[in-house]
């Protein structure tokens, strides 16, 4: 459990206690199917005001099978479609390259891939597979110094 602010090491104040919760969208009808639950408490730093949850979840636990798919949200899809139309209008007849970090299931890039070179990067196995099924070039990795160097060496610079 986190006792001090991740940013400034100030004291944390409990704002909201949600009790034991599964990871994002990992909801099960039967208790026997239930995966690991986490004590989820939201805190605010008394010093810098940053809001944060009180636990560190291993990246493997969080992303090996990620359960939140952006495409299931009508609002997110509508927003992605509207945003992609703005990009298409602004960069019409231009050859640009688009990189989306945390591309999830490709919900944004699927609207742009036919007009522009698009690359997604996401650490989740299942979201990467979905994105690739749309024909989107997607790297399964975290975005960090190593992956950014790989991207630059293999794909060059990106415009967006």
Predicted regions mapped to residue ranges:
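Conserved SAM-binding loop of SAM-dependent methyltransferases across substrates and taxa
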Residues: 105-115
